[in-house]
UniProtKB/Swiss-Prot annotation:
Pathway where this protein functions: Purine metabolism; IMP biosynthesis via de novo pathway; 5-amino-1-(5-phospho-D-ribosyl)imidazole from N(2)-formyl-N(1)-(5-phospho-D-ribosyl)glycinamide: step 2/2
A Pfam family of this chain: AIRS_C
One Gene Ontology molecular-function label: ATP binding
Record keywords, A-Z: ATP-binding, Cytoplasm, Ligase, Nucleotide-binding, Purine biosynthesis
Signal peptide annotation: none
Name recorded for this polypeptide: Phosphoribosylformylglycinamidine cyclo-ligase
Residues that span the membrane, as ranges: none
Amino acid sequence: MVSYKEAGVNIEEGYKSVDLIKKHASKTFTKGVLNNLGSFAGMFELPKYKNPVLVSGTDGVGTKLDIAFRMKKYNTVGIDCVAMCINDILCHGAKPLFFLDYIACGKLEAEVAAQLVEGVSNGCIQSECALIGGETAEMPGFYRDGEYDIAGFAVGIAEKDEIIDGSKIEDGDILIGIASSGPHSNGYSLIRKLVEDLHKDFEGNKIGNTLLTPTKIYVKPVMKLLEKYNIKGMAHVTGGGFYENIPRMFKEDFTAVINKKSYPLPNIFSHLISLGIEEDHMYNTFNMGIGFVLCVNEKDGENIIKDLIEMGEKGYKIGYVKKGDKSVELI
């Protein structure tokens, strides 16, 4: 007789991981959560909205995970997972409600799984949303030992008549960029080709640790700005960089004109250019120091930037909108 454990699935380790995970998830619970982890499904009571619309998004972390494997640092990529989902739904003005995660591995290590969920929990706390469920899948022979994948699913809410869909964007509106924390979770397949020694010094730190800096979550500053200003469009700068993501906020045919010298380029991107990536290709791959973009009336620009600074963020007027063909023009 062959046991499940002999087939590569350790049920006891699974029970241990669940116990470790529960304490991290419970820290994220908000008043809408109706049950604890361990049920067949998570339940969340919707707040009182006049005409509510649920806004959802799903994403993963990609090959940034390989940096985490090699550095044996597992408690930050969970933040990335949350950020990649939450920042997307934020683009439509949605307030995050709850999050679910999915972790897959070849051999389950409870302590590693707990570190992953610790990161997810921290990301949810930053996003002011609840981690109400998830799945940890142990699949022997499918993943190599020591490797795993993580993905997430976020749900937010917005009043129907307050959804931001780009329909109010006009010729002459300005673009405000909010600084990123680094490459975030995109471009790592290219980074891994160029950066072989992750323990090499970079500005007093191992470059592997620098590359594991978590993706910035923009919920708190953006939700505060939405209370005061007419924000017409928003873009989360992810894979595809400026060229692919900024036009996604446009409902009509506009061109985003971006001044590359309007903000300081972070050193990590200058370093990647020095390793042999063409600058134009960088803007089509990385966020280049700007992780989130707002489209607003020109008259609000200075005050928005002041408010961002007061909230501890770095904001810059990086360009403007003109009639065009849903494209980006760098100057």
